[in-house]
Amino acid sequence: MQSLENGRWLNEPTKAEASNTELSVTTDANTDFWRETHYGFVRDSGHFYAFQAQRDFTAQVRIQAQFKNLYDQAGLMVRLNERQWVKTGIEFSDGYGLLSSVLTNETSDWATGRYDSDPSDFWIRVTVQSGVLRIQASYDGRTWPLVRLCPFPEADHYLVGPMCCTPERAGLEVRFSEWRLGRALGKELHDLS
């Protein structure tokens, strides 16, 4: 595990506390990351606790939260700038905690799928390597099925870290722990470890 003390906030929440082992956040009202698609608006107000990563990396974190309102969300973000980023994790929609990923390259897309385990306690992993983004989720921190595989812009470095938003309210309490950031794991696509 690595320390969660030295991240840098984009849109620091009113209530947040970072220690060596965990980051606790309570979301502010009307926070979100989105660009244009369907809704026609741009929002760059979500909470993002960023660490710098080199060209090829893997990051993962455990997330605990009680998602209950529409669009409550928490997970990881990888960001180049306000127009090129991805956020992924659990997002509450249509009465369920869904596995969600939003890939943005000028405009946002949104891909979701049902999460069959407990959405209040999960792990999310992102790997960026050679222009490819791989997202995996886990219910136990040991088995990591694929959520998404897609192109992602190559860069010398990225910002990556915990992300949470509540577009419709304030007050989602999120605990991030078991943070890891390092070189890309380089595993085969169907290696779920």
Model regions: which residues?
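Extracellular glycan-recognition regions
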Residues: M1-S193
